[in-house]
């Protein structure tokens, strides 16, 4: 097997500075512009998060750090490698390229968006910002332990990774309310970014802006939703309670009896796979070098240079960059360990089915409004006229991509019960691994080394949050690459 070494670091020519937009609606997350506004916006809050990080204050709004110790450093990064070609990696590459960096996107598959970003539920859902770190989650997990068709399934076989993750999950329960509020803020910011990028690049992704309807079959679930709505409102999201009669008016095709619901008109749905692939093409138009079929074997950094060993069509090669951004989903934990950091993402499997609506009767009987059934934890999206996506469940079973019939069957049964006029003759099953942090907050920020960054761990909200965290990461890297010295907290490496 051949081994080749290649440098992707530009020469000694003057560094190309990060691009700054004159119009704040063109380039979101710019701290100075947002501070000029008399009324704080969500983007200003994200910018304030970045300001707090540069001053060594505790991180907020999803930017995670493990230490408040400071390191004064000055760096002029020109070339950056982004590891991972899913929605998070591609949006990150796009945000960095817009700021003038020389970006290489490294993806082990032949195309972008072939794993977790392939066939998710499709919801761009600020209304789903509630984190899972609630005591009821543990109760349900124990109750459903022996049910193979349960919405939440935990393999009881122990592993240190699983035990440490759940220990940190339990430790995060006191921050449930605060993290839910901050996730709602991030989600609202993200959709503004994403819509603007889609319009700027002419991306068509079966986007449907008809809101998301949460349905509840009993009083207990509905009353809990009312408490969640107050947290979402604190994060800036408006949604309204609806009666069973209003549920029928919002989505007439839905069968069954329901206690009540909550409707979020500002939420929407779309095809994550199509969006990610088209944005990857937009990245290439901006000069991003998208290298597919490249499996990252190892990565290391000395603080000023990052070296990445790859296995691809040309054999084993080594490439060097000024910096690296890890957006590798469930693979981020292993890469972080090589870089001296701890990113405790756990793979939580979710399933989906795509129902092909082959006849006019099925197309009429399928819903157009996106749904979330609280009892079954299933979500839906109508993708164009001829596809109906149903997704959900959470399975803690390690790195396991098997598509199990006993996990797919409840999704098909749910369609037949709630939409009896939809033919399930042609159904495409799928399973993907969500990269989840124990506190349900994405890892966005610096690593131990000055030129190492992370944007990963978005869990079930990767599609929803990706554009905001990518833009925030772009701001952080741009600040690091500025000619003047800046003060940034160094993320302490955990044992």
Task: Give the positions of each predicted feature.
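Glycine-rich FAD pyrophosphate-binding loop
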Residues: 98-118
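Helical element adjacent to the flavin cofactor pocket in flavoenzyme catalytic cores
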Residues: 223, 227-235, 257-315
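C-terminal catalytic lobe of FAD-dependent flavoproteins
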Residues: 375, 417-495
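N-terminal Rossmann-like FAD-binding beta1-loop-alpha1 element of flavoenzymes
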Residues: 78-105
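Dinucleotide-binding Rossmann-like beta1-alpha1 core, especially the glycine-rich loop
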Residues: 119-243
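Short beta-strand to alpha-helix junction loop
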Residues: 178-188, 214-224, 249, 262-281, ...
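Active-site substrate-recognition segment that forms the wall
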Residues: 120-123, 128, 132-170, 298-305, ...
């Amino acid at each position: 097997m051949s081994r080749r070494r290649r440098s992707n670091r530009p020469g000694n020519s003057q560094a190309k500075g990060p691009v700054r937009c004159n119009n704040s609606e063109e380039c979101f997350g710019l701290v100075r512009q947002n501070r000029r506004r008399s009324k704080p916006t969500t983007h200003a809050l994200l910018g304030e998060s970045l300001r707090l990080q540069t001053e060594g204050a505790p991180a907020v709004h999803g930017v995670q750090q493990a230490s408040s110790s400071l390191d004064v450093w000055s760096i002029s990064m020109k070339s950056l490698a982004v590891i991972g070609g899913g929605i998070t990696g591609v949006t990150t590459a796009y945000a960095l390229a817009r700021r003038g960096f020389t970006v290489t996107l490294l993806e082990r598959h032949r195309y972008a968006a072939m794993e977790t970003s392939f066939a998710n539920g499709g919801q761009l859902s600020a209304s789903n910002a509630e984190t899972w770190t609630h005591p009821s989650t543990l109760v349900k997990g124990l109750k459903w332990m022996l049910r193979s068709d349960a919405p939440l399934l935990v393999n009881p076989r122990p592993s240190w990774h699983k035990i440490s993750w759940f220990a940190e999950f339990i430790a995060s329960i006191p921050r449930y309310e605060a993290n839910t509020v901050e996730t709602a803020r991030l989600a609202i910011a993200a959709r503004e970014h994403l819509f603007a990028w889609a319009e700027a690049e002419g991306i068509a992704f079966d986007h449907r802006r008809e809101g998301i309807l949460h349905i509840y079959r009993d009083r207990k679930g509905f009353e809990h939703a009312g408490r969640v709505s107050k947290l979402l409102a604190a994060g800036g999201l408006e949604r309204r309670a609806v009666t069973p009669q209003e549920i029928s008016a919002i989505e007439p095709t839905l069968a069954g009896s329901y206690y009540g619901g909550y409707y979020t008109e500002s939420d929407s749905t779309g095809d994550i796979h199509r969006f990610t692939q088209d944005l990857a093409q937009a990245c290439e138009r901006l000069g991003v070098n998208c290298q597919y079929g490249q499996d990252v074997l190892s990565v290391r950094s000395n603080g000023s240079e990052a070296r990445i060993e790859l296995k691809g069509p040309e054999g084993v090669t080594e490439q060097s960059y000024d910096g690296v951004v890890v957006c590798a989903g469930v693979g981020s934990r292993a890469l972080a360990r090589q870089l001296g950091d701890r990113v405790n993402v756990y793979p939580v499997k979710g399933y989906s089915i795509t129902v092909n609506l082959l006849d006019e009767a099925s197309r009429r009987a399928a819903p157009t409004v996106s749904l979330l059934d609280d009892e079954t934890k299933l979500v839906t999206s109508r993708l164009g006229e001829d596809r109906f996506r149903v997704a959900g469940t959470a399975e803690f079973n390690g790195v396991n991509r098997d598509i199990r019939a006993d996990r797919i069957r409840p999704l098909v049964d749910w369609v037949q019960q709630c939409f009896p006029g939809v033919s399930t003759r042609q159904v495409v099953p799928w399973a993907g691994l969500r990269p989840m942090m124990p506190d349900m907050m994405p890892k966005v920020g610096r690593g131990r080394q000055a030129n190492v960054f992370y944007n990963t761990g978005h869990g079930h909200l990767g599609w929803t949050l990706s554009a905001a965290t990518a833009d925030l990461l772009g701001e952080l890297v741009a600040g690091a690459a500025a000619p003047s010295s800046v003060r940034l907290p160094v993320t302490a490496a955990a044992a």
